[in-house]
Design a protein with these regions (language model features):
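Internal hydrophobic alpha-helix adjacent to the cofactor/substrate pocket in enzyme cavities
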Residues: 1-7, 74-90
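A conserved FAD-binding loop/helix module that cradles the flavin
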Residues: 60-79
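A glycine-rich dinucleotide-binding beta-alpha-beta segment and adjacent secondary-structure elements
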Residues: 1-61, 67
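Glycine- and aromatic-enriched mobile tails/lids
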Residues: 58-63, 86-90
Length: 90
């Protein structure tokens, strides 16, 4: 609370710590750069050798835990990165 008051907050709503959360959607996957941050490989549209390998690629949350999907995408991404490095494109 002291931190909020120090920066001028007039109201704060403390919440208990969460046992776990799934933070999603901050680096949206998209076909076109104007619609998101990364392509289908998790590669950023503007920096060819920068990849995002977490749940932030998801455009929205699903009904189930995203961990296995995140792992699957990361494995697929690792194969793609290895292939691109072998070709000298990144």
């Amino acid at each position: 609370m002291a931190l909020y008051e120090a920066v001028g907050a007039t109201r704060a709503f403390p919440t208990p710590p969460y046992p776990s959360t799934h933070n999603l959607g901050t680096n949206r996957m998209s076909e076109k750069a104007q619609d998101g941050v990364v392509n289908k490989w998790g590669q950023t549209h503007d920096i060819s050798n920068l990849f995002v390998s977490d749940g932030s690629q998801f455009t929205t949350g699903a009904a189930e835990n995203p961990t296995l999907t995140i792992v699957s995408l990361a494995i697929r991404q690792a194969d793609y990165i290895a292939e691109q490095m072998g070709q000298g494109t990144i």
